[in-house]
């Protein structure tokens, strides 16, 4: 943190550069369990970056921090505003977290599952992966029928990827695709599994099939264009004879700009 503070002392530092340094300092405060200081710094960065993407990125961080702290209604209100962000990634992340919070707040049940899940998310952010996994396991055991089942599997997959346990991560993602494939995290899980197969597990044919699945099952996903490009690349490297079914499917997946798949 001392290095970051020295960076802030550099003369004629641009506001956005200063904002990036302050954001890292705030992240460290979250990591070190000092949420109120982090909240204050995030607010300063937002105030100084109202007209650029950094402002929205930090608004998302601030909303997530409120979620970590259990202020679910407040966090959801901030996230709902961010769903209109010009950054597709920020808007998508805000939408997913807002829907997850809303789906659980609207239930006529205890808030304990959501509180536990938020705790696990904070531990994961703090790189306390083993502790996060313990909380997720406890949540699944204590509340086996809560609507967070697919979220729990997705968080476990992300933890195992960070732990370099890619095969185990793939199993969690496969469970989401098989059982919750058309729910909120369906496209996230499908794309993440395709990336694992493509770059970590060296299963190129399986990756190619999953990228194609993304185009047919989730045409409106933020991952669609990237999946199309990677499918084309793998198709060129690993060509196969099209089945009649695949030929019909690809008619609906042509890129409007190029009129080709």
Predicted ranges, named:
Residues 1-261:
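Acidic, polar-rich low-complexity tracts and alpha-helical solenoid repeat scaffolds
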């Amino acid at each position: 943190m001392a290095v970051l503070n020295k960076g802030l002392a550099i003369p004629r530092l641009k506001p956005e550069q200063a904002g990036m340094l302050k954001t890292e300092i705030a992240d460290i405060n979250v990591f070190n369990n000092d949420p109120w200081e982090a909240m204050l710094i995030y607010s300063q960065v937002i105030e100084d970056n109202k007209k650029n993407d950094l402002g929205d990125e930090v608004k998302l961080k601030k909303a997530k921090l409120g979620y970590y702290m259990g202020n679910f209604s407040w966090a959801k209100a901030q996230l709902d505003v961010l769903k209109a962000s010009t950054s597709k990634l920020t808007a998508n992340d805000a939408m997913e977290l807002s829907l997850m919070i809303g789906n659980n707040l609207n239930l006529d049940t205890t808030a304990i599952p959501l509180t536990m899940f938020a705790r696990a998310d904070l531990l994961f952010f703090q790189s306390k992966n083993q502790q996060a996994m313990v909380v997720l396991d406890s949540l699944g055991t204590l509340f086996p029928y809560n609507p967070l089942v697919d979220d729990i599997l997705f968080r476990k997959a992300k933890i195992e990827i960070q732990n370099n346990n890619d095969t185990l991560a793939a199993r969690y993602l496969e469970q989401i695709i098989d059982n919750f494939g058309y729910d909120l995290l369906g496209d996230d899980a499908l794309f993440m599994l395709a990336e694992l197969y493509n770059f970590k597990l060296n299963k190129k044919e399986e990756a190619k099939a999953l990228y194609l699945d993304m185009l047919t099952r989730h045409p409106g996903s933020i991952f669609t264009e990237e999946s199309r490009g990677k499918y084309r690349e793998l198709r060129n490297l690993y060509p196969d004879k099209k089945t009649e079914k695949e030929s019909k499917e690809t008619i609906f997946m042509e890129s409007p700009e190029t009129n080709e798949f």
